[in-house]
Structures are given as C-alpha cells and as structure tokens.
A protein has these predicted regions:
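…; additionally, a secondary subgroup of soluble metalloenzymes is captured
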Residues: 1-63, 69-220
Length: 220
C-alpha cells in the first residue's frame, strides 16, 4: 500500500522513474523469493493443491460481483470504504487455480465453476466444461449461468432484482488500465474504488441485500 501511495503521489516522468526504481529494489527480491518458495511447496504436490482450489461460494438471493484485477490490498482499501459507508463487510481469500491469469482464474470465479475442469491438453490455460471439448469462454459461461436462472447484470443498466437464484455482474477496469498505464495505474486506484462503491450502492438499490465481490488475480 505504501508503494501504491508513493507511485500515486508523483506526476513528473523523472519522479515516477525514481519511485519505480526504489519500489523495484525493495520488492523484487522479496517477490522472487516468495514465488520460488511457493513453487517449492507445490512441486510434486499438484493434486493436493488442486484439491484446495475452490470456486466462488454463493448464497441464495445474493449477487456475485466480479471486479477484474482487484488485488488483495486494494480489496482491503475497498472494504474500508464500504465499512465507512455503514455496510457490513468481511474480507477473505481463497486459493486460485494456477496459473493466476484471467483465462484460468476468472471462469472459476463464476457461478459455473462446478462444471469446469483443467487438463494437460487445454489451450491458452482456459479450462473447459466437464465431459466436453468446449472451452469455458465468456459467452458459454454466461449461457450456463443464465440456464441456472442467474440474473445477468450489465455495468450501467441496473434492473430490479428478478429471481432468488442469484445475480452476476462484471465490473472494474484495474486489469485493463494496468496494461495501458503500467505503474501510473496507482494514480487511478481511488477512481476505480469509487466506481466499485457506486456499483455496490446500485445493486443494493436494485434489491440485492447480499453482495459477494470476487476477482481473478492481482498484479505487480
């Protein structure tokens, strides 16, 4: 969080480059050591790790709100803002499928995760539907959720809550902005958090009394 605040505090290219170098010097050795340690822990224990990977939990009558690239510390910042507005909030984590890229982790964050599987022959790390050669792309996932009676919601159009099976909303541009802006994404965090807050408020106004916010991966 201190690194994000430092990067967000400067605007001039020279200042940004200086802060980036400092952050890199401090964090890169730790990140590298952490990644290698994690690899060592799972080496030879892939089946045990796979068994610990779970999809997003979902309660009846609740809306699952997928926020792309909502890194854990940024999720903590969102939780603080939600609490400040009087919402009851609980922050938790789960083990994501590997590799933690959108094509792998996002499908398991959906309400269709129980129908998905991996495999050595999958393409571009994209899981497929069980007993099917079909990759779990965005449209097939939405079609499957719709067949279960899930309300599929748009970012801007917020219809009133329809059924009691649950809802699904995709929102957030942290991942997209990160690819475009690089380290300058830090200056956009506040704006993106406010957008997520507005989405939560809109869902509540539409009749959703419980919202679970999930994501696919973080970023460096």
């Amino acid at each position: 969080r201190a690194a994000l605040e430092a990067l967000a505090s400067v605007k001039q290219p020279a200042d940004m480059a200086l802060i980036q170098n400092v952050v890199r010097a401090l964090y890169l050795p730790w990140l590298d050591a952490s990644a290698r340690h994690f690899q060592g822990l799972i080496d030879g224990a892939e089946n045990a790790v796979r068994a610990k990977v779970t999809g997003s939990q979902h309660e009846k009558d609740s809306c699952l709100m997928f926020a792309d690239g909502l890194r854990y510390d940024v999720a903590g910042m969102l939780a603080e803002r939600l609490e400040a507005k009087g919402y009851r909030v609980r922050l938790s984590h789960r083990l994501a499928p590997l590799p933690t890229v959108t094509s792998t982790a996002k499908p398991f964050a959906t309400l269709s995760h129980d129908k998905l599987e991996g495999g050595e022959d999958i393409v571009d790390f994209n899981p497929r539907f069980k007993n099917s050669p079909q990759a779990a792309n965005a449209q097939r996932l939405r079609d499957d959720m719709a067949s279960r009676g899930i309300d599929l919601l748009g970012e801007d159009i917020r219809p009133g809550k329809q059924g009691s099976t649950g809802g699904w909303l995709e929102t957030g541009k942290l991942d997209e902005l990160g690819h475009k802006l690089g380290a300058r994404l830090a200056a956009q965090i506040d704006t993106e958090l406010e957008i997520l807050l507005d989405q939560v408020a809109g869902l509540i106004e539409a009749g959703w009394t419980r919202i679970r916010i999930v994501t696919d991966h973080g970023w460096l």
